[in-house]
Curated annotation (Swiss-Prot):
Residues 342-352 have a biased composition (Polar residues). HAMAP family: DNA_mis_repair (MF_00149). Pfam families: DNA_mis_repair (PF01119), HATPase_c_3 (PF13589), MutL_C (PF08676). GO terms for biological process: mismatch repair. Belongs to the DNA mismatch repair MutL/HexB family. Keywords: DNA damage, DNA repair. Gene3D superfamilies: 3.30.230.10, Histidine kinase-like ATPase, C-terminal domain, MutL, C-terminal domain, dimerisation subdomain, MutL, C-terminal domain, regulatory subdomain. The gene is mutL. InterPro entries: DNA_mismatch_repair_CS, DNA_mismatch_repair_MutL, DNA_mismatch_S5_2-like, HATPase_C_sf, MutL/Mlh/PMS, MutL/Mlh/Pms-like, MutL_C, MutL_C_dimsub. Residues 337-367 are annotated as: Disordered. It comes from Kosmotoga olearia (strain ATCC BAA-1733 / DSM 21960 / TBF 19.5.1). NCBIfam families: mutl. This is DNA mismatch repair protein MutL.
Length: 602
């Protein structure tokens, strides 16, 4: 086949494949156009998740009739004039692709009334071609309506997600703009239901509870740092206020939401050791830099940026988070006040049911312990510099030869030969220590208990539910709320009982294995699991949710086990031959006598 030039129609549809990846991407592009047009109020409406209908209206400066007809042509824009402008982008858009690519794969109507004009224009487009135009009189600004997205590319339309999933993704896009531009008003309507109707806010602090209703102002620490031409502002949460995913971490660079793992990593590094493994803080951070320091033209949807000095930005974020925590008196070390190992106070029974308030509270049962202030951090550095040298250097192969039980199964015959393992106790309120014939067995109490609960729940025909005397009204952000409506049956199989009364949602029953104090948090994490995994098969959904429920109801780090409880857990672990928790983490490890002997040159 000879080389030839592609028709314009084909070029547009190829470009649309990069820009239009779902209904959410159409909303994103149209809202960005509205904000670039100096809009102070933006209204978004969708139907059927956006697959049937999308509308974005604004009160911006509008377009003259001749500009409007030009705007749907490829590579037409008002935002840049020359190549040098690409080095100092101050707007959301600049490529001149959005309207042309969206109109090429949909039916579209655009009405615009320019500022200080008596007459505007409405045009109707189908598959990229204007099929009708007429005069328009209306309020200042622009309204774009998109119908039947991807109607002329059925092969791509079938890859759109379900209406509910597409709708949730649109909601998340709207939420990002709500946070990014607090001084703009936003109205959001989904399938005729008013979700948000927000007037301009003076501070971002007013918008955070809208997007994250589980947060209150007392959970938040203000971040304000400026260094080396980089300004970082926003809010983070205390180390105890976390979630099991990064959905609570949002970073905006020059007002633009970006999705870059290295920036999330910088936030988490700023917390030092204060975060429990597998837990992530809430962080809404705004990074302002000279536009010439970043390149926003590296991602089709502009979700990533390239920094001229990425390490400088990384260090600035880490320092901003760390300084904020120190100023609040929060330690970035995890140090706990516990009884001396081996003392008689090392064991205490775990209170059950509703009395188990302290250990069931996710903010108290994570093992964060006493907070150190900045002076203690400095003392720690001082002590590290005065380490006493040893005459004998340990054999590093000891660490390499530690044999995890994840790599081999316990043989039941071994248990018979050695009798029951001899329990030493619980170390650090997280690890059970026991002697076997081969060496020292160390068991993660949470991981082991989590797997035992998971297996028990899996064998049960139905998880028992206990009715609450006083129903709890749930305050859920919109993505969780819509997901709960969609997956109500799956959630109720776990023992949660849900009641919808208009736009209000009540928790009327909880799994019998959970206390009331952790039930709402457990439900939120179940919903987040569904949202992140996007599971559709009922068996996979149920299995995945069981593991989440088991994790929430299991013994936590910081929960003190009595000697009999630790022994019972150890016996069940060996009896069931459990190697991993439901999330794949090993539950135990074995340090063999021969490795200890080699370490001590015996």
């Amino acid at each position: 086949m000879k080389i030839h030039e592609l028709p314009q129609e084909v070029i547009l549809k190829i470009a649309a494949g990069e820009v239009v990846t779902g209904c959410f991407s159409v909303v994103k592009e149209l809202v960005e156009n509205a904000l670039d047009a100096e809009a102070t109020t933006v209204e978004v409406e969708i139907k059927a998740g956006g697959k049937e209908y999308i509308r974005v209206s604004d009160n911006g400066i509008g377009m003259l009739p001749e500009e409007l007809k030009m705007a749907i042509k490829p590579h037409t824009t008002s935002k840049i004039q020359c190549i040098e402008d690409l080095e100092r982008i101050l707007t959301y858009g600049f490529r001149g692709e959005a309207l042309s690519t969206i109109s090429s794969v949909s039916r579209m109507r655009i009405s615009s009334m320019p500022d200080n004009a008596d007459l505007g224009l409405t045009i109707e487009i189908s598959g990229g071609k204007i099929v009708r135009e007429k005069s328009y009189i209306g309020p200042k600004g622009t309204t774009v309506e998109v119908y039947d997205l991807l109607f002329n590319t059925p092969a791509r339309r079938k890859f759109l997600k379900s209406q509910r999933v597409e709708g949730r993704m649109v909601t998340e896009i709207v939420q990002r703009f709500i946070l990014a531009i607090p001084d703009a008003g936003f109205k959001y309507i989904r399938d005729g239901e008013l979700i948000y109707d927000l007037t301009p806010a003076e501070r971002i602090l007013e918008r955070i509870p809208v997007v994250f209703p589980e947060l209150s102002t007392t959970d938040l620490l203000e971040v304000k740092e400026e260094t080396s031409g980089i300004s970082i502002t926003g809010y983070i949460t205390f180390p105890e206020r976390t979630r099991f995913n990064r959905l609570g971490e949002m970073v905006f660079v020059n007002g633009r939401y970006v999705r870059q793992p290295e920036l999330n990593y910088a936030i988490e590094k700023g917390y030092g050791e204060s975060l429990e493994k597998g837990r992530f803080p809430f962080a809404i951070l705004f990074i302002s830099v000279n536009p010439e320091m970043i390149d926003v033209n590296i991602h089709p949807q502009k979700l990533e940026v390239r920094f001229s000095n990425p390490s400088l930005v990384f260090d600035a974020i880490k320092r901003a988070v760390r300084n904020t925590l120190r100023t609040s008196g929060t330690s970035i070390l995890r140090i706990e006040k516990r009884p001396f190992p081996g003392s008689s106070t090392n064991y205490s029974g775990i209170q059950q049911d509703t009395k188990k308030q302290e250990s069931d509270n996710p903010e108290k049962a994570r093992g964060y312990g006493t907070h150190l202030r900045e002076t203690h951090w400095e003392q720690r550095d001082h002590f590290e510099k005065r380490k006493v040298p040893l005459h004998y250097q340990p054999d590093n192969e000891l660490l390499l030869n530690i044999e995890r039980t994840a790599s081999r199964r316990f043989e039941k015959t071994e248990a018979k030969e050695t009798g029951e393992p001899r329990l030493f106790g619980v170390f650090g309120e997280r690890y059970i220590l026991a002697e076997t014939k081969d060496g020292l067995l160390i068991v993660d109490q949470h991981a082991a208990h989590e797997r035992l609960i998971y297996e028990k729940l899996k064998k049960a025909a139905k998880i028992q539910s206990q009715k609450l005397l006083s129903p709890i009204r749930l305050t859920l952000e919109d993505s969780r709320k819509s997901l709960l409506r969609e997956k109500k049956n799956d959630v109720e199989k776990l023992g949660f009982q849900i009641s919808f009364e208009g736009d209000r949602i009540f928790l009327t029953g909880i799994p019998s294995i959970l206390s009331e104090s952790v039930a709402v948090n457990a439900l939120n994490e179940v919903l987040d699991e569904l949202r992140l995994e996007g599971l559709e098969e009922p068996e996979k959904i149920f299995d995945h949710l069981l593991s989440t429920l088991a994790c929430k109801s299991a013994i936590k780090t910081g929960d003190r086990l009595s000697e009999s409880e630790a022994k019972e857990l150890l016996e069940k672990l060996l009896e069931e031959e459990i190697l991993f928790c439901p999330h794949g983490r090993p539950v135990s490890m074995l340090i063999r006598f021969k490795d200890l002997d080699r370490h001590f040159s015996r």
